[in-house]
Amino acid sequence: MSDTAYPSVNDLTLEEKASLTSGGDAWHLQGVETKGIPGYMITDGPHGLRKSLASSTGETDLNDSVPATCFPPAAGLSSSWNPELIHKVGEAMAEECIQEKVAVILGPGVNIKRNPLGGRCFEYWSEDPYLAGHEAVGIVAGVQSKGVGTSLKHFAANNQETDRLRVSANISQRALREIYFPAFEHIVKTAQPWTIMCSYNRINGVHSAQNRWLLTDVLRDEWGYEGIVMSDWGADHDRVASLNAGLNLEMPPSYTDDQIVYAARDGRIQPEQLDRMAQGMIDLVNKTRAAMSVDDYRFDVDAHDEVAHQAAIESMVLLKNDDDILPVAANAKIAVIGEFARTPRYQGGGSSHITPTKMTSFLDTLAARGVDAAFAPGFTLDLEPADAKLEAEAVETAKNADVVLMFLGLPEAAESEGFDRETLDIPAKQVELLKAVAAENKNIVVVLSNGSVVSVAPWAGNAKGILESWLLGQAGGPALADVIFGKVSPSGKLAQTIPMDINDDPSMINWPGEEGHVDYGEGVFVGYRYYDTYDKAVDYPFGFGLSYATFAIDGVNVAKTGANTAHVTATVTNTSDVDAAETVQVYVAPGKAAVARPKHELKGFRKVFLKVGESAEISFDLDERAFAYWSEKFDDWHVEAGEYTVEVGTSSRDIAAVAVVTLDGDGKALPLDEWSTFGEWADDPVGSKIVASVYAEGEAGNLPQLPDNDMMRMFLKSMPINSMPMLMSDGGKAITAFMLDEYAKIAETAE
């Protein structure tokens, strides 16, 4: 044993090292107890602890777990735009892990919502990588601040459930770097998650678990990741290849440790690589020892329920509020229609399914608060046809009410881990019920329960108010009552565009793929990056959300702070008679670019609570990355010189003010050669001078003159200069030779 407090890889035999790279059972590390390395528990939990009651036996049961606080899934939390609140959720989750002796909680999942039909959208954050990364980092930092580990997942490009165990996500390098990697990258660089879970799918033909470029070259060497990488459950198909790629831990165990031993002995695994992977597992255990050594700890159930309550309040997005139908007056005659009001859908299905410590429905909350309301279920929470008797009862109940609160949405069978949705619509029987009620009473507020966006446009005309409540966790009932009756103002903002029609989504042409692959043909134009760039009509834009208050944004100023950095300031004022919160959003719009870029991209946001008449100055620092795109030519981030517009507003389509900043650019340039086009020479700082010389020498009669008309200039622009002889015969050869010779002289002088 070494002199350190805990064993290191140098204290282990080859067999013991190999054993650390596989689990002990479905929910435990293997450990080496004889060397003082315990086999701690790891378990599910993107939005709360799901410790299966069968965990002690190593079995899996998705619906039978110890009671834990069920916080709103990421579909709701993401709409809070409140990283500080999300950090508190993370802290609470960690405390519950400490009580249950869970060393690592498996989450958060930060895969991009490429398509709203994705079956797991309820536990992912956004269509925007900046928002996803800057929110989900709160879970990671909050959990790990208490000495419990997280598992950032699913790395990478796990954006659908259809064929997820084997599908190849075929994605350009630029789209990976700009859309599918940044949330992971930001969290790695700012919070260092103790574990990362690789995805099931292949990326450009290579399984994530066996992808050394992904797990080592990018994750560790480029981003500086210090933790371990584990497989998703059953995603490791070749232990030797995966370990060599940078996978520390296979889960669950395949009981093939001998494969690692044999490979280490015959040279297929280098000793240093096995040592690195095993030492990573020891380091993980050591990080969690203190928290796992706390005995008789009990978390505060009520305090955690209050965190869930606040999270649920801030998760709701008010989409429509005609005639100020919300908030509802305390003395109003209220009808509540919809089974969701009595039997709430508070979480998604699959591995994140939690047994809550408490559960209070909206109807229970009304009763507890002494609010009188008539109720009719209206429909059943299944995919069966409409029940005429339930419909008739609901219409009669709603007929004479001052306000009808209709709870509509997706039943659990409609969205879950394991399959993708087939439609954006809510069940037809619910829409027909809404229309029937609206025929008798126009004062309707629809309260939606769903894990991903649903079509609103087909039925929105039948309601004066629409409150998107997502899946609110265990405290959704009280939170809904607080918002609906005006105790608090809604403050949520959409983290995902609501399209007019699912076929408007740019990914639909390649969704969900075919014959084992899906081509991400939309490239970087995901979500609002597509809709806003191509001016497509949407139902509700990214970042949108109404309030009971009104706000004004002014005093926007952008100051250049470096060659390619800027500082943004703005003042936001509550101009209403309601205390409320507003989220100010900053977008960066490029000017002229060498590649196709989105119209604008989110690069900053700040949620601020303001009392009536109160103002606050807020500021944002935009680093070089905020202005950059991934250049496949340079294989690196690239900032072009020129003007950029900084937009400040409250959604991607509600911009209050803009300011322009001129950047120097990063000066990147590839050496020019005979295969560089005439246009590339003309755009290059050095090449442009040589192009000018070509025209000047032609005027002087020292070189053949280039054709000088609009058509030929366009023709030349995309022509490599070694093709000019095809256009001008010997004259083209002379021009090409002159350009290359002049370039060589300049390069020689620079050296």
Regions found by a protein language model. Give the residues of each.
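In a subset of proteins, long, contiguous C-terminal domains/tails are tracked
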Residues: G527, G543, S547, D577-D579, ...
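Conserved, compact domain cores that house catalytic/ligand-binding motifs in diverse enzymes
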Residues: F678-I746
